[in-house]
Amino acid sequence: MGSMEQQQPESAAPATEASPEIIFRSKLQDIAITNTLPLHRYCFERLPEVAARPCLIDGATGGVLTYADVDRLSRRLAAALRRAPLGLRRGGVVMSLLRNSPEFVLSFFAASRVGAAVTTANPMSTPHEIESQLAAAGATVVITESMAADKLPSHSHGALTVVLIDERRDGCLHFWDDLMSEDEASPLAGDEDDEKVFDPDDVVALPYSSGTTGLPKGVMLTHRSLSTSVAQQVDGENPNIGLHAGDVILCALPMFHIYSLNTIMMCGLRVGAAIVVMRRFDLAAMMDLVERHRVTIAPLVPPIVVAVAKSEAAAARDLSSVRMVLSGAAPMGKDIEDAFMAKLPGAVLGQGYGMTEAGPVLSMCLAFAKEPFKVKSGACGTVVRNAELKIIDPDTGKSLGRNLPGEICIRGQQIMKGYLNNPEATKNTIDAEGWLHTGDIGYVDDDDEIFIVDRLKEIIKYRGFQVAPAELEALLITHPSIADAAVVGKQIEPEIGEIPVAFVAKTEGSELSEDDVKQFVAKEVIYYKKIREVFFVDKIPKAPSGKILRKELRKQLQHLQQEA
């Protein structure tokens, strides 16, 4: 994985008054950010103050690991990862194929100590999806659980070491029994080892994202980029998100998703808060945990906000401990905000906006600040501090002023280093001046608040998950009765987003049905990528270059909906 050494484009100097570009910055003052530490040391920098405090609370068992426990166990695991048979070194890659669990957190920071990167994957993914990511990321170690282990490619077991966190199984190592022995002879990785394995621009997290177009790609997030992103949110005298060590943060969102990994796990650890870890989301169980542990901070996504807003049971629960509800991954309308706040009148509800490639947070609601600002319903915050944001005309590239919608671009040390082994996609996303082009259309109003209004990019967003049309199209055309295919998103409720819809051109004489197409895809992809509707057409509209004309398909879809 030597290409992870490719350099992030250098940031241009901050714009001056004479610059023709219109650049927006945070209302909060920039701060000094220590982003040259290894990520694990940065997140645990307050360890001497919080060592005895709860760090991870297992929502299923009630078990508690203190900050001292998490530090000790992650050091022990790091030492085990370095030893045979794993032999992990700087530049290596570990796949974390886990639901939320204490083991997820320990694995992530152990890999950071070794100088390796963690590529996070959804354990509900199909075998094909997992195998593709394993191969693309170059992972040599997989830390997983029995429910996902059977999905791993059997032919790669010689080159792949599998570690299970739950049951013992032939051919696999056991997380606790084989790697985490507590006998005195078992070494702990020390801070002095960091100097041997660390550079702030080394990759530490390798989530997969489809970006603005195409197939999933490895997003190279470095120690520097992630520590910068965390600092932008929770560091300084007046942090953008006013968290503190007395907070109890709910982790109901999957840690394999960058929102949870960064804003819940890393930010929570940075401030010394307790994190209540939910293995699997369930609305009743979530409300139980809020009551039992007096949760104060609840990072959610719009579908969960909607579920709480519509839940009759929520009114009978004591959710009064919650003081802050962060919503991200998809836009949310005012009617849902109002219905939700009726259930939690004592909480502040606000939205943020992110993109995996941006580290991921671009903007955050300033009502969460230690010294809060008034904010508007429907806004997704203002740009984070120590960063620059501009709105450009998608056709001309010219920067636009306030209240003019255009493509959102972000620049700062929090953005990705690039896409793994894909310089062309990197070049198409981060320009020569260091601006990351998001593919989202939005505007900045007179109060510096950002509103998302449309999507320039092809990616479909369903319940906060990314669905890449190109991935589904590549699968569809492998069917012997499909001559050509294209996939677009069909907007349903704003809080849910879009569903994948396929336009299919059948081979001559084919009797292929809509159910045939749906079932063919469903066997190969995770649930949120399933095709929900199929329309048969004579041919797929394409430009002379062969590029699918998705605007034409969206017009056809709109016409079909009107006819229905």
UniProtKB/Swiss-Prot annotation:
SUPFAM superfamilies: Acetyl-CoA synthetase-like. GO terms for biological process: phenylpropanoid metabolic process. It catalyses: (E)-ferulate + ATP + CoA = (E)-feruloyl-CoA + AMP + diphosphate; (E)-4-coumarate + ATP + CoA = (E)-4-coumaroyl-CoA + AMP + diphosphate; (E)-cinnamate + ATP + CoA = (E)-cinnamoyl-CoA + AMP + diphosphate; (E)-caffeate + ATP + CoA = (E)-caffeoyl-CoA + AMP + diphosphate. Pathway: Phytoalexin biosynthesis; 3,4',5-trihydroxystilbene biosynthesis; 3,4',5-trihydroxystilbene from trans-4-coumarate: step 1/2. Its cofactor is Mg(2+). Residues 282-351 are annotated as: SBD1. It comes from the Eukaryota. CoA binds at residues 280, 463-464. ATP binds at residues 209-213, 217, 351-352, 356, 440, 455, 547. It is an enzyme of class 6 (ligase). Induction: Induced by fungal elicitor and UV irradiation. Down-regulated by wounding and UV irradiation. Keywords: ATP-binding, Ligase, Magnesium, Nucleotide-binding, Phenylpropanoid metabolism. Residues 352-419 are annotated as: SBD2. (E)-4-coumaroyl-AMP binds at residues 259, 263, 329, 351-352, 356, 364, 457, 461. Its EC number is 6.2.1.12, 6.2.1.34. Expressed in roots, stems, leaf blades and leaf sheaths. GO terms for molecular function: (E)-caffeate-CoA ligase activity; 4-coumarate-CoA ligase activity; ATP binding; CoA-ligase activity; trans-cinnamate-CoA ligase activity; trans-feruloyl-CoA synthase activity. It holds the Pfam family AMP-binding_C. InterPro entries: AMP-bd_C, AMP-bd_C_sf, AMP-binding_CS, AMP-dep_synth/lig_dom, ANL_N_sf. Involved in the phenylpropanoid metabolism by mediating the activation of a number of hydroxycinnamates for the biosynthesis of monolignols and other phenolic secondary metabolites. Catalyzes the formation of CoA esters of cinnamate, 4-coumarate, caffeate and ferulate. Is more efficient with substrates in the following order: ferulate > 4-coumarate > cinnamate > caffeate. Cannot convert sinapate to its corresponding CoA ester. Both substrate-binding domains (SBD1 and SBD2) are involved in the substrate recognition, and are sufficient to confer the substrate specificity. Belongs to the ATP-dependent AMP-binding enzyme family. This is 4-coumarate--CoA ligase 1. It comes from Oryza sativa subsp. japonica.
